[in-house]
Design a protein with these regions (language model features):
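Positively charged, solvent-exposed patches that mediate nucleic-acid binding
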Residues: 1-145
Length: 145
């Protein structure tokens, strides 16, 4: 019985390690130059209740030292509250993307994304934002096929 408990604990620890390893393997990289933003904002977009996603297919898949890189930027308009509110919205959106990556859900790494958050992300619960993000990334993956 003690051996079974130890085995279960060991399996739980291994699962946690693997989830963290998967998250570490995919690095979120933000866009840095305004030319990149302008180019992507002229491409395709999808509107959702909590955000708008602009996306463009990368010309080449980016890998650095066996780490996969997801090019994604979270942007807020200055009209939305103060800096504290805008940063909280960005954190919520970023954690939703990280959770999607942890659960091996469909985020296509061959795309570059710019996500414009909306004000209602601040008020609503994380699970609603996560569900909406998951649905939008599924739609993008289906559009790619």
């Amino acid at each position: 019985m003690v051996e079974n408990l130890l085995l279960e604990e060991e399996q739980k620890e291994e699962k946690k390690y693997l989830l963290n390893y998967i998250l570490i393997m995919i690095k979120l990289k933000s866009l840095s130059k305004s030319k990149q933003f302008i180019r992507i904002l002229k491409k395709k977009k999808l509107n959702a209740k909590y955000f708008t996603i602009y996306f463009e297919k990368n010309l080449s898949s980016v890998k650095k030292d066996d780490k996969k890189i997801l090019n994604i930027s979270f942007v807020m308009k200055k009209k939305i509250g103060n800096a504290v509110i805008r940063n909280r919205i960005k954190r919520k959106l970023k954690s939703a993307v990280q959770k999607i990556l942890k659960e091996k859900q469909p985020i296509d790494l061959n795309y570059t994304y710019v996500i414009f958050g909306r004000n209602n992300v601040y008020k609503d619960k994380f699970q609603l934002v996560f569900g909406e993000a998951n649905d939008m990334f599924k739609r993008i993956k289906q559009m790619a096929k």
